[in-house]
């Protein structure tokens, strides 16, 4: 189904042991996207990550009003847990994966973000 209109902003909330420890971090709709990583310097970057996250670990962006998450060649991988079915996807290959509010992103072993609508 083709979506119309403009994608709404997403938020990332950092979770550790089921407790909120950071955020919310607003991610604005953009084809360039926002970078998440230990040394991400771009506008809108999120650097609230654990010690095993790469410098530029993940990109979140929109294309045709659909949100995507893309691993940027991280050393310790990225996993997406889909809220709709609980399926855990390894997205470390760099192929963009569709992202929805309610999903969870795990960067390496120490960083987990809940994806929320804003």
Language model features: what each stretch is:
Residues 1-51, 98-104, 109-118:
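Intrinsically disordered, low-complexity acidic Ser/Thr-rich regulatory segments
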Residues 45-51, 61, 69-71:
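Short histidine-centered beta-strand/loop micro-motifs
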Residues 38, 62, 71-72, 82, ...:
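Residue-level recognition of conserved beta-strand positions in structured domain cores
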Residues 57-59, 65-104:
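Forkhead-associated
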Residues 18, 60-61:
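Intrinsically disordered, low-complexity regions enriched in Ser/Pro/Gly/Gln/His and often acidic
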């Amino acid at each position: 189904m083709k979506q119309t209109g403009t994608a709404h902003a997403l938020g990332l909330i950092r979770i550790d042991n089921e407790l909120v420890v950071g955020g919310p971090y607003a991610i604005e709709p953009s084809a360039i996207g926002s970078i998440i990583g230990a040394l991400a310097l771009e506008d809108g970057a999120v650097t609230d990550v654990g010690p095993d996250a790469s410098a530029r670990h993940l990109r979140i962006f929109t294309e045709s009003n659909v949100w995507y998450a893309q691993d940027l060649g991280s050393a310790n991988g990225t996993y997406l847990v889909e809220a709709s079915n609980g399926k855990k996807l390894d997205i470390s290959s760099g192929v963009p994966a569709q992202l929805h509010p309610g999903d969870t992103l795990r960067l390496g072993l120490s960083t987990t973000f809940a994806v929320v609508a804003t």
